[in-house]
Amino acid sequence: MISVAVNGYGTIGKRVADAILKQPDMRLVGVAKTSPNYEAFIAHRKGIKIYVPQQSIKKFEEAGIPVAGTIEDLVKASDIVVDTTPNGVGAQYKPIYQQFQRNAIFQGGEKAEVADISFSALCNYDEALGKKYIRVVSCNTTALLRTICTINKVTKVEKVRATIVRRAADQKEVKKGPINSLVPDPATVPSHHAKDVNSVIKNLDIVTMAVIAPTTLMHMHFINITLKDKVEKKDVLSVLENTPRIVLISSKYDAEATAELVEVARDLKRERNDIPEVMVFDDSVYVKDNEVMLMYAVHQESIVVPENVDAIRASTRLMSAEDSIRITNESLGILKGYLI
């Protein structure tokens, strides 16, 4: 049983903490919070131990939230830390993890240099075995890598061109925008996503562009893949249908908008309406000779959660990629095939 700490209990952290509680080989030591907001109250209500910075203890106690100790205490009590702090903050915490000689999993908001390896479970699990510091790539990069590495099983992927329509903010982020604008992210080519993909697949020819849209629900990707050999559409659809963490969306559902997909998640009683699988619209899959085009939706709040669970096992050498991915998927109810 591996003892896991989660530093940060926001959008990703609370989902990772809940995922750890569902694993048969992991124990959640507790979570770290810096402010006694509603998420801290809910964590306490769930019975999760809360650790805080030394200077914040009084603030939490005055709010009526018991404190189990400092963040340093949390790190010391764990075997490995999943750092889900805001972008750039994880690098500031790394010296603490080093001080107590603890392995750590970082998120895609950190620079790749913070870790020994950037990670995508379907692409490079074996390369991450035993690595002390692993960086799970961002939500968009996770979706790109899942898709690319899956299609690479049909025949070698030689070139990728992708356009990413990014959601402007998560649903709880009331101070972010835009409200009524499309914002190039950035207005130069390539966007950072290409470099991030190359942190996992070193020599792939990939160019990405991105734009921020006034929505909070999901991202959308439009990608063009050039393969080494000619392929048939049925072979591409088959590999997508039979790969875990990818689901196909049929036009028969009459649910192709991201808002409708969220409603599907509600009706399926998905926790927090999460869909951690890449959602590929099957009618969008276009194949001509060695060229493949497709579009898919990405639920940014949950797609990296199973990757974090697998990264814990890879870092601590708990088990093989196949076993870890299977156990993670089973415990979290993650599908393959068609969503409905």
From Swiss-Prot:
NAD(+) binds at residues 11-12, 109, 167, 300. Belongs to the glyceraldehyde-3-phosphate dehydrogenase family. It comes from the Archaea. D-glyceraldehyde 3-phosphate binds at residues 138-140, 193-194. InterPro entries: DapB_N, GlycerAld/Erythrose_P_DH, GlycerAld_3-P_DH_AS, GlycerAld_3-P_DH_cat, GlycerAld_3-P_DH_NAD(P)-bd, Glyceraldehyde-3-P_DH_2_arc, NAD(P)-bd_dom_sf. The active site is at 139 (nucleophile). CDD domains: GAPDH_II_C (cd18127), GAPDH_II_N (cd02278). This is Glyceraldehyde-3-phosphate dehydrogenase. One of its GO terms (molecular function) is 4-hydroxy-tetrahydrodipicolinate reductase. GO terms for cellular component: cytoplasm. GO terms for biological process: glycolytic process; lysine biosynthetic process via diaminopimelate. PROSITE patterns: GAPDH. It is an enzyme of class 1 (oxidoreductase). It is found in: Cytoplasm.
